[in-house]
Amino acid sequence: MKLLFVCTGNTCRSAMAQALAEKMIKDNGLDFEVDSAGLFADGHSPASENAKRAVEKYGATLDAHISTPLTLKAVSEADKIYAMTADHLKLLVLSLPELSEKAE
């Protein structure tokens, strides 16, 4: 199963969700792939310092994270898409109505 977390710039919320999910998956020996992207990500920004500090409290890291723009390929490959806010979800489903079944 492949999970995709989506927010605005992929430097905070979705990046943190990815890092924490990857840690939980590894710690529990689960078989999931995890990715994150931003609706308006520029593709070259690091995670915010606050996001880095927040995930470090839980033993995860964002030191190597670089923002990733959302692509149709990422959307089509994901089994489940988690939008970080109701507005992100609304924009996703309005733009790609076929996502309504796998996005929340």
Residues covered by each model-derived region:
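Hydrophobic structural packing positions in well-ordered secondary structure
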Residues: 7, 82-83
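Small/polar loops that bind or transfer phosphate-bearing groups
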Residues: 13, 83-84
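Phosphate-binding/catalytic loops
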Residues: 80, 86, 90-104
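Conserved active-site segments centered on acidic
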Residues: 1-77
